[in-house]
């Protein structure tokens, strides 16, 4: 159980919220979060890398010169791996890098990662109604009022998508905007500071609570 102070758009205290999420035991927390992170990064790989073997490279069917009598080294194909333009030995081939992990474990890792970042988490009121039109400066100034240092990597979590918020945030190079349902291990661990709306935290408890 963790208690957070909720800040309004101006950075003033507007209430409190309690987050209750079941997390992994201390001795296994790092391991399960690490497994979930490795899974996410592995599953993001396309695995479409490919190289051609000597049998797949175009040409090379004819013996370049006779076996004996030329004084040159023996050669059976111009596509030998020893030749320029030849095939590749043990080169990369398309493969599936995906890693399986039980859903219960994935959610446990996500909850554990979120609670582990409690000291870096700032909770604010829903602010979409404060942005009547896309304005990057408004969001940048709000982050400063909420105590977020300039230049640090920020993960901004909202309950739902809002076009004005998205357009205002996308010009801030160090800020990543996601919704509560798109919460993931990498973004949680990669950010220096996490800013979440109170509604987003409630949705996280509803979706991932256990």
Curated annotation (Swiss-Prot):
InterPro entries: Ribosomal_uL4, Ribosomal_uL4-like, Ribosomal_uL4_dom_sf. One of the primary rRNA binding proteins, this protein initially binds near the 5'-end of the 23S rRNA. It is important during the early stages of 50S assembly. It makes multiple contacts with different domains of the 23S rRNA in the assembled 50S subunit and ribosome. Residues 43-80 are annotated as: Disordered. This is Large ribosomal subunit protein uL4. The gene is rplD. GO terms for cellular component: ribonucleoprotein complex; ribosome. Belongs to the universal ribosomal protein uL4 family. Residues 60-71 have a biased composition (Basic residues). Pfam families: Ribosomal_L4. Part of the 50S ribosomal subunit. HAMAP family: Ribosomal_uL4_B (MF_01328_B). PANTHER family: 50S RIBOSOMAL PROTEIN L4 (PTHR10746), LARGE RIBOSOMAL SUBUNIT PROTEIN UL4C (PTHR10746:SF17). Keywords: Ribonucleoprotein, Ribosomal protein, RNA-binding, rRNA-binding. The keyword Ribonucleoprotein applies. GO terms for biological process: translation. The keyword RNA-binding applies. Signal peptide: none annotated. GO terms for molecular function: rRNA binding; structural constituent of ribosome.
